[in-house]
Amino acid sequence: MPKTRRGPRRSQRKRPPTPWPTSQGLDKVFFTDIQSTCLETVYKATGAPSLGDYVRPAYIVTPYWPPVQSIRSPRTPSMDALSAQLYSSLSLGSPPSPPREPLKPSRSLPHRPLIQPPTFHPPSSRPYANTPPSEMGAWSPPLGSSSQACPSPTPASGPKTCTPSGEAPSSACTSISFPPPSPGPSCPR
């Protein structure tokens, strides 16, 4: 069975150029500069003995940054003084020194907790019996209306229980809906 060629043979002309000097005009020498870390092409005259007499081009220079001018105010200590103070205060041999001036509590404001825990009232037949009307948060009927209003939502859950406006004022509408229902002779169902 004869072997078949799968592709054309590569031509010898597309080879990369050899890295060593050739005898034509100028020699191309590739080397890597340590500081610039990039591949450079150096042209040398034909017959140069070695790379020892190579002079680095003038455009490749190490960066030089001018010293930063001092912009701090006269009263600000320098970073050296700050670092020395920090090092002396954080040395391992001595314990940390207490603050120079302890914080004094202000006497004008009484000490109160920032967050008060929520109070839970268990559901009962009269949820607002011991609460003054200013803290009830219930909807008040407009002046001239004689109907019993439904208070705002209570922690109790369950079905709505509404009574007509003719019964005792101790009965209340227990509901979870918000905002309070519109005024009328009875609560909406």
Swiss-Prot record:
One of its GO terms (molecular function) is RNA binding. Phosphorylated. GO terms for cellular component: host cell cytoplasm; host cell nucleolus. Residues 1-26, 87-189 are annotated as: Disordered. GO terms for biological process: mRNA transport. The modification Phosphoserine is found at residues 70, 177. A motif (Nuclear export signal) lies at residues 82-93. Residues 56-70, 123-131 are annotated as: Homomultimerization. The modification Phosphothreonine is found at residue 174. Induction: Down-regulated by P30II. Homomultimer. Multimeric assembly is essential for activity and involves XPO1. Binds to human XPO1 and KPNB1. Interacts (via N-terminal nuclear localization signal) with human NPM1. Belongs to the deltaretrovirus Rex protein family. Rex escorts unspliced gag-pro-pol and singly spliced env mRNAs out of the nucleus of infected cells. These mRNAs carry a recognition sequence called Rex responsive element (RxRE or XRE) located at the 3' region of the long terminal repeat (LTR). This function is essential since most HTLV proteins are translated from unspliced or partially spliced pre-mRNAs that cannot exit the nucleus by the pathway used by fully processed cellular mRNAs. Rex itself is translated from a fully spliced mRNA that probably readily exits the nucleus. HTLV-1 lineages are divided in four clades, A (Cosmopolitan), B (Central African group), C (Melanesian group) and D (New Central African group). This is Protein Rex. It comes from Human T-cell leukemia virus 1 (isolate Melanesia mel5 subtype C). The lineage of its organism: Viruses, Riboviria, Pararnavirae, Artverviricota, Revtraviricetes.
